[in-house]
């Protein structure tokens, strides 16, 4: 339970997550905006909420602001840093490739164990910033 000032019977514990923390996938990058979007929901189907983090300004494959999302499964009530997963458009699960200013990970939703990821800056059919969403069936 959260107890920020140390008042009461339960002491507080705060864990700071970023891409400079050992075990977290990816590398820290100026301006990547890790944590722009955060969602706690059970996507690993173990009955415990996991943490999804959007980093829409992350460089992917040399494309600035392409974006990623990170999944931190929870183990014993804490985010697992050694089993986190990083998702981006250059992975084979996604059609296409990373685009500059695609902003993948600006929004995240779930439908059961599936992930729905917003990419509002995605160019589509030659139209700039037309936007797209990705449905990742897990």
Predicted region positions:
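Conserved beta-strand/short-helix segments
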Residues: 1-138
């Amino acid at each position: 339970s959260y107890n920020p000032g140390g008042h009461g019977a339960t002491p507080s514990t705060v864990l700071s997550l970023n891409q400079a923390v050992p075990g977290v996938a990816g590398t820290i990058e100026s301006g990547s905006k890790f944590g722009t979007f955060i969602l706690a929901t059970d996507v690993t189907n173990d009955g415990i909420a996991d943490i999804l983090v959007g980093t829409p300004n992350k460089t992917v494959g040399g494309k600035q602001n392409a974006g990623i999302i990170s999944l931190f499964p929870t183990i014993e009530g804490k985010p697992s840093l050694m089993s986190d997963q990083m998702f981006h458009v250059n992975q084979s699960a996604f059609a296409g490739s990373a685009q500059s200013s695609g902003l993948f990970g600006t929004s995240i939703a779930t439908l059961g164990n599936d992930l729905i990821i917003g990419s509002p800056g995605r160019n589509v059919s030659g139209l700039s910033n037309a936007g797209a969403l990705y449905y990742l069936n897990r």
